[in-house]
Amino acid sequence: MSSSDDEVLVWGPGFGSECGEQTSGLEAGSTAPRGPGPDPGPEPGAPQSGEGEGGDGFPDPEGFESEREVLEAGGPVLLGCEGRPGSPADDTGYVVQLSDESVAAILRQLADLDLLGIRRHMSPESHGVGDVSPLRDVEARPGSRGAAAQRCGEAARAEAGPRWVGRPRAGRAWGNPKRSTNVAVDRQWPPSVSPARLFSDSESSDECSEIQPMRVSIYPKDGGQAKLNSPKDPRDTPRHSNVQGRETLPNVPGTCLSSAPRGLISVVERQGKQGDAEQETISPPKKIQSVLWGKGGSLPSFPGVAAAAATAAAATGRLPRPSPRRKRVQEKKSLGGVSKPALGRTFPSWGRGISATPLDPATFPPISGIPLLGRSQKYASVPWGAKESKHTGAGKKSVARRARELVAATAVSGEDNDPNRDPVPKGQLATDRPWPSCPRVHHGEPSTANLSIRGGQDSGNSKPVAMNKGEVMPRGPGPSGDQKPADHHPRLKRRQQPPRRQGCPRCLVLQKEIDDLKEQLASMQYLAEKFRIL
């Protein structure tokens, strides 16, 4: 056969009634070998092997009309049914006439199998339908070479020959005949070549030799594993899982792959993941529950009971669910257990006196400065005179009474024995010193506290002070037992500032005590602010 010859090999069931099995036709050009008879050559209106084709690469009915005329005039004989060399058939020529209906049926069947990739529900009796090799595998183009086309045809015949009706390979790939299966007859194409443009350039014979014509994939409906039938080693094909079976078809286009393996893969993967998750998550929930219960149980103030409950929950694997009322009780206990030691640790007591009972933040009044001094009786750092600051009007009366008694005592025991001078200095000493010496102290209760301090401290040193004050400010005559002038002297002293007050030694001591009180007040305010934050 010359290089310009083109041939078309067609396989399919029911190609003729004379042979009783699959037949094939050979179409040749003007130089193709023919049987006995005249060789009229190509007709003017007859299309060549590449002419008259549609977009799909298949000849149209008009082209086949002309080809039928060529065959009737002495065209090629059928493969497999022609006479062997030396037989009488070679001499007489065996011509088969194909009707237009049979050619159209063949073309429709081949187009359905090759282009659309229809999946068929096949029974063991109709397995030959899936083994039909498409026409496009060996279809020739106008510029193709005869040798390349012949190689393609031989490869197609060699691979399609073993697969025959009634002889399914190895039986394993077809599964149980009684079981309904899905058979996908898919074509494996190279990854870089699409099926539509595979044979656009048929000059290279490597493409034809590398192409495997067919792969039959059967996916059982009952959820079994997919079995692949390879044309090379059908009996040695191992059983693959759905995922591996999918990986063994890397070159099949997405349109050719059936949806059955994807569904099976998704279902099996989902079931496998669920099974693994069930196996792996049998123990973690128990552990998580025990950990959560341990954390929740560590909040109450009884760690032993919480630890026992946590170990019991971990051993049994059941998470006890406390009622809302029990949760509230536990929260209250946890708040109480945390706040009591925290106060003792965070704010240690100062001074010598330590209270045994913990401080309650709710009992602290808002900061006003002076009311906080009322709690200073529990601490030794606060002077003893400040204890009287929390008393009401009765405390003030007692302070005034002490001042009057001190004035009377100094008047009786004075060196001068002059009752006219003594009451006035004593009243001035007891009542007037806090006003100039404490300019920033409130004029309420602190003044009474300082009065009591002055009265207690001046009782031993009343004689020299009384003498000095007596010499500076003499007063008019008055009865020694009369104590009324002591009540009016603070008002008079506010108007008349006595001289030499800046050089008094007692002012330094009083100022020092005032500074100490201010420091204590600041510390108390700081602590009260912290308690309020907590």
From Swiss-Prot:
Q: Where is the composition biased (Pro residues)?
A: 35-45
What sections of the protein cross the membrane?
Answer: none
Q: Where is this region: Disordered?
A: 1-93, 123-260, 313-349, 383-505
Q: Where is the composition biased (Low complexity)?
A: 145-161
InterPro entries cross-referenced by the UniProt entry: DUF4641 (IPR027822)
Superkingdom per UniProt = Eukaryota
Q: Which residues carry this modification: Phosphoserine?
A: S87, S123
Please provide the record's keywords in A-Z order.
Answer: Phosphoprotein
Task: Read off the Pfam families from this record.
Answer: DUF4641
Q: Where is the composition biased (Basic and acidic residues)?
A: 230-239
* Annotated PANTHER family: GENE 4779-RELATED
What is this protein called in UniProt? Uncharacterized protein CXorf49 homolog
This protein's species is Bos taurus (Bovine)
